[in-house]
Amino acid sequence: MPLYEHVFLARQDASSQQVEELTNQITGVITGLGGKVTKTENWGVRSLTYRMKKNRKAHFVLLNIDGPAAVVSEIERQERIHEDVIRYLSIRVEEHEEGPSAMMRKADRDRERDDRGGGFRGDREGGFRGDRGPRRPREEAPAVVEE
């Protein structure tokens, strides 16, 4: 059977529980039509590049699907009708990616970066150019003597 990667975006004001129920509903449709979901990833609420249907953020969910084309057309039809789904995209792939997806690896990398602390150039002391050492003493101007 063909392999698909399917991503859908749910509205930001939908709760995590509602998104989980929507994911389970879609998974039920897939298994009911003879397909199977090999991996499900919830990427959480992320900012959108531009507004979609008056939303600036959305819940992102990835499904790896192994099933006939009729499965994909049916879940896309149901997502078109569902009011919580903003966008969806299904892509046919040659093989599914093993392990976490690129988005999950990026999230892990960002968490590691936050754990290091310090922010931008946190290892440096001082201001813009780091610690430059003490200033040299100022040379005094010669005193003007009036006669």
Curated annotation (Swiss-Prot):
Q: Where is the composition biased (Basic and acidic residues)?
A: 97-141
Which gene name does the record give? rpsF
- Which GO MF terms are attached to this record? small ribosomal subunit rRNA binding; structural constituent of ribosome
Q: Which organism is it from?
A: Nitrobacter hamburgensis (strain DSM 10229 / NCIMB 13809 / X14)
Under what name is this protein listed?
Small ribosomal subunit protein bS6
Gene Ontology CC, one term: cytosolic small ribosomal subunit
Q: What does this protein do?
A: Binds together with bS18 to 16S ribosomal RNA.
Alphabetical keyword list: Ribonucleoprotein, Ribosomal protein, RNA-binding, rRNA-binding
Q: Name one Pfam family in it.
A: Ribosomal_S6
Does the keyword Zinc-finger belong to this entry? Answer: no
Report residue spans for region: Disordered.
97-147
Please give the family membership noted in the entry: Belongs to the bacterial ribosomal protein bS6 family.
Q: Please, which domain of life does this record's source organism belong to?
A: Bacteria
**One GO term (biological process):** translation
